[in-house]
Curated annotation (Swiss-Prot):
GO terms for cellular component: cytosol. The keyword Protein biosynthesis does not apply. It is found in: Cytoplasm. This is SsrA-binding protein. Keywords: Cytoplasm, RNA-binding. The gene is smpB. The keyword RNA-binding applies. Required for rescue of stalled ribosomes mediated by trans-translation. Binds to transfer-messenger RNA (tmRNA), required for stable association of tmRNA with ribosomes. tmRNA and SmpB together mimic tRNA shape, replacing the anticodon stem-loop with SmpB. tmRNA is encoded by the ssrA gene; the 2 termini fold to resemble tRNA(Ala) and it encodes a 'tag peptide', a short internal open reading frame. During trans-translation Ala-aminoacylated tmRNA acts like a tRNA, entering the A-site of stalled ribosomes, displacing the stalled mRNA. It comes from the Bacteria. CDD domains: SmpB. It comes from Limosilactobacillus fermentum (strain NBRC 3956 / LMG 18251) (Lactobacillus fermentum).
Amino acid sequence: MAKKNHQGLDANLIAQNKKARHDYTVTDTFEAGLVLTGTEIKSVRARRVTLKDGYAQFHNGELWLMNVHIAEFAGGNIFNHDPLRNRKLLLHKKELKKLQGELTAKGVTLVPLKMYLKHGYAKVLLGLAQGKHEYDKRNAIKKREQDRQIDRVMKHY
């Protein structure tokens, strides 16, 4: 079990993409390792990561994480990393083949949902997702509001 800090939050959670669950319907999730440089892992441990605009894509049979911002390390020197560079994702070959087959469908993409540390290694939770239409988002908001209303009424009984 992950360690909890004094606020009750998961101590190993680095960043979370809350907007992804709102904008996409996530059908499946995969845990992948990241290939990072020294200054990148230091910035990750300092929780200076933004997953908001990120996505994963195949290039030459390898899966790459694109457009994820890992801030430059403050104590870095001229060898500091580029904050938006593409980072290689590490998955088993079987998982890569499965993902490559599923990503061929129209409208399906791979988005990062969470980044966390597991046994000292940076991991990213990827979601196989399909984009929601505007009316899907409105229906989700309407359903959430109805659930809240039911909870309020049931609280008094």
